């Protein structure tokens, strides 16, 4: 195991354990009901998720780009083989990416596409679009934005209506951003 992989594993374990400790059965029941049982829930509050990610970033200061996207992927996945993905872990992945959006690159669009496809909840899709993808695209240079536009064009033609909607929203954001950059 490399140093980055060990750090990511320890950070994921820290976040998972903390979220479980912060959970409450009544919130877990409410989330399960709201999401139709598609995702498991620990019952952690949104504030607890944000605080846990903040604490993890303080504890594991050396997370670079690769470590950040590896940790987000670890949190997004199933906590154990055969288990259902957990809403709060996925929300923690979104909060992590929000916190480190400046590290993201156009090449991360494929991973984020996977997150959008498997989100199973608007409570995850909306912040992924507004707080991760839109600022990431806005921070790209011209060449990287052109490459990202190719990916968005593919999303626009995808049969998944969620990806089509994401492409439309993000392309509109990019058009507005590019128009404002050209205006003196």
Label the model's feature ranges.
Residues 1-184:
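Surface-facing alpha-helical segments and adjacent helix-coil boundary elements at the starts of domains
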């Amino acid at each position: 195991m490399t140093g980055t992989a060990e750090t990511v594993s320890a950070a994921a374990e820290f976040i998972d354990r903390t979220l479980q400790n912060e959970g409450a059965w009544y919130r877990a029941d409410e989330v399960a009901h709201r999401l139709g049982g598609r995702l498991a829930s620990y019952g952690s509050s949104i504030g607890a998720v944000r605080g846990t990610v903040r604490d993890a970033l303080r504890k594991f200061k050396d997370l670079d780009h690769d470590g950040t996207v590896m940790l987000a992927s670890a949190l997004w996945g199933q906590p154990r083989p055969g288990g259902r993905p957990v809403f709060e872990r996925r929300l923690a992945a979104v909060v992590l990416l929000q916190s480190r959006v400046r590290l993201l690159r156009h090449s991360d669009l494929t991973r984020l596409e996977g997150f959008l496809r498997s989100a199973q909840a608007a409570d995850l899709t909306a912040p992924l679009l507004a707080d991760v993808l839109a600022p990431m695209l806005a921070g790209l240079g011209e060449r990287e934005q052109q490459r990202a536009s190719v990916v968005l064009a593919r999303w626009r033609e995808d049969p998944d209506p969620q990806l089509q909607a994401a492409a439309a929203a993000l392309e509109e954001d990019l058009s507005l951003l590019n128009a404002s950059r050209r205006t003196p």
